[in-house]
Amino acid sequence: EQMQERLLLSMIEEAPAGSDFIVLPETVWPYAYDERYLPQAPVVTKIREILREKSSGAMIVTGAETIVYYPPEEQTETARQNERGAFYDKFNSTLGIDTTACLPIHHKGRLVIGVESTPTWIFKALKFLVIDLGGTVGQLGVGEPGPAFVHNGVSVGTPICYEGLYGNFYGGFVREGARALLISSNDGWWGDT
């Protein structure tokens, strides 16, 4: 996990000077992050430091696994309960990180059936059948096409991988104000591209 974080940071350091956006893969982050603490997470702080030093005008659009906790009366259909009784969802997300305090997040809304969209109780029984292609498996939380990430006056939608197969969903990013789409994916899903 530390090696993966070092690779993540080195990819950002190697980005060409003058880049407006740096797009990283869907599952590049080594941990799942609680969204309440994400803006202060050490890796986000390091990324912002690198951007200030090397690419102050850039926004990193990166995939990440995030966690949202709910009060019992507000839990979602996809929420699960942890050992302490708290309800939460894990999300396949994209983040927009720049040198400001703003940290927009998009939660994937079209999940891969059988990998990202499998109720936890079924997944536990059938886990031995799952092929690991990277990322989280099991039942994830579900998002909607979100408002565009705005950086330096440019509005971008940040769909994640499989969402690109759903034209109307994909178009939702444009309806929400995106002028460009930056898709975060693991290329292994698509073969030799």
Where are these regions (language model features)?
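Enzyme catalytic cores with a strong preference for nitrogen-chemistry domains
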Residues: 1-193
